[in-house]
Amino acid sequence: MHRGPIPDFSVLVLKELRRRGWRKAPVVIASNADSCVLSYIDGMAATTRMLRNEAVQLECLTEVTRIVREFHDLLAGADLAGDREVVCHNDLQPPNTIYRRTSGRLLPVALIDWDQAAPGDRLDDLAQLCWRFTGLGRSASCETVRERIAVILRTYGWRAGTQPVTKAMLRCQQKARDQIQVGAGDGDDMFQRLRDAGALESIQRDRDWTKAYLVD
């Protein structure tokens, strides 16, 4: 699969995951300053509303959390993590996840779009999971979202309670909003498209909902 260039660090992360035998991310076939060729992963990204609704169901949540825990554990203590706990993906969401149907069930099989990968803490990606994979928002049931967050944290093995996670979700949402705003202001086409599509307002609504219903 041909695409534009990706950051050098992301290339190193993908190569290290492959070296360690992890097969739930694309393989870098070739990369230079102008373009990158990645292996094709059979399946579909959850880019439609129907698939996104399926992606937040408990079985899918459990499996995608296991995938995140796997690569965190693989890269914990690696040189790429520097002095941080792990290497984080930093853009975990259903459209960046490849799914396949198995016996009629939708299940995640790989993570794509590693452009924002960077050294970080496990909590950073956990916050992304709990924000992007739980269906939170204006029409969401608080009880359902809390149940989904509990499943993510239990599956991951997180034992430090939910409040550090919900506070990290707020930081993650603000960071995403700031990134779009700054990038669009700097003339980046992708961030301008996101801004024009209403991403800033959407993220702010998610942030307001998180504050209102998840932060004790």
Model segments located where?
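Short, polar/flexible loop-turn hinges at active-site or ligand-entry regions and domain interfaces
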Residues: 51-54, 118-120, 136-140
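Eukaryotic Ser/Thr/Pro-rich intrinsically disordered, low-complexity regulatory regions
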Residues: 165-171
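ATP/Mg2+ or Mg2+-diphosphate-binding catalytic cores
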Residues: 176-216
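Active-site activation/catalytic loop segments of kinase-like enzymes and analogous catalytic loops
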Residues: 125-158, 173-183
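Catalytic activation segment of kinase domains across protein kinase-like and atypical kinase folds
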Residues: 86, 94-129
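A conserved alpha-helical element in kinase catalytic cores
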Residues: 1-74
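Conserved kinase catalytic-core helix
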Residues: 50-90, 95, 101-104, 149, ...
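Short helix-to-loop capping/linker segments positioned immediately adjacent to catalytic or ligand/cofactor-binding
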Residues: 75-83, 137-141, 160
